[in-house]
């Protein structure tokens, strides 16, 4: 049986993910247990593991119910254990072997102290560390300098061919900010057009790649910690001057 991957939206803009390889399956950031169970059923999967990219409740809120209903093991970084209760700590771990599922773990503190990125079969699940066109804020237990260091030194060292799969779809809000910073950015303009075309068609946005984000995302185009911190502060206060055409 080939490996399978699913992304599912819940609430307005959250994403959860299902990873399946053979008889083994894991859920990532299943904040809505009903949606998570429906996706798993659609794929004929019984997830044995629940992985969390960070501890915020909109991503971890389904863990307790899913653990009870599925008998699943919950994994997350211990630095975020004040928000949820992982059965296994991801701190210091660079690899996970969960049955047939093999993932790389990249610790990326900043949005929260225990934020991690999960890499699986050419995909990078970024939680709220990196979004399409933007990055997470640090208002709820985060640290802008640590976030900047993670973007520069952790994300910055990863393969540009990786698909980016974030914890939220904020692309239509983020990319106009990128274009206000650099109105001549063809990469940001093309990506915004792609996202809007998907929305008009009633479809989910296609995933970007890390290389694409390095071209279109101002937080990955910045070259210093100070520059990223400054951009994050500016984004926190930003409101669009005028709608971007298209």
Per-region residue spans from a language model:
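Active-site HxH/HxHxD metal-binding segment of metal-dependent hydrolases
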Residues: 11-12, 25, 32-105, 190, ...
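Active-site neighborhood of phospho(di)ester-bond hydrolases with catalytic His/Asp-centered motifs
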Residues: 28, 48-56, 73-78, 108-110, ...
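Short active-site segment of divalent metal-dependent hydrolases/proteases
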Residues: 57, 61, 114, 131-132, ...
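Active-site-adjacent loop/tail segments of enzyme domains
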Residues: 134-161
């Amino acid at each position: 049986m080939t490996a399978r991957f699913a992304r599912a939206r819940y609430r307005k803009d959250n994403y959860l993910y299902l990873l399946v390889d053979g008889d083994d399956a894991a859920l990532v950031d299943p904040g809505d247990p009903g949606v998570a169970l429906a996706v798993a059923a659609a794929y004929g999967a019984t997830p044995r593991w629940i992985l969390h990219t960070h501890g915020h409740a909109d991503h971890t809120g389904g863990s307790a119910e899913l653990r009870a209903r599925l008998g699943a093991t919950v994994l997350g970084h211990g630095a975020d254990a004040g928000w949820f209760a992982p059965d296994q700590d991801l701190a210091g771990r660079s690899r996970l072997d969960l049955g047939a599922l093999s993932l790389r773990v990249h610790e990326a503190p900043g949005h929260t102290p225990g934020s991690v990125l999960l890499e699986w079969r050419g995909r990078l699940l970024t939680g709220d560390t990196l979004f399409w066109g933007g990055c997470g804020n640090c208002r709820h237990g985060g640290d802008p300098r640590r976030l900047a260091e993670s973007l520069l030194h952790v994300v910055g060292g990863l393969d540009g061919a990786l698909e980016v799969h974030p914890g939220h779809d904020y692309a239509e809000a983020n990319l106009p900010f990128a274009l206000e910073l650099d109105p001549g950015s063809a990469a940001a303009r093309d990506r915004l057009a792609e996202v809007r075309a998907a929305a008009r068609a009633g479809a989910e946005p296609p995933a970007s790649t890390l290389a694409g984000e390095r071209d279109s995302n101002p937080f990955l185009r910045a070259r210093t910690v100070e520059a990223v911190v400054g951009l994050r502060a500016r984004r926190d206060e930003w409101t669009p001057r005028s709608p971007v055409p298209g």
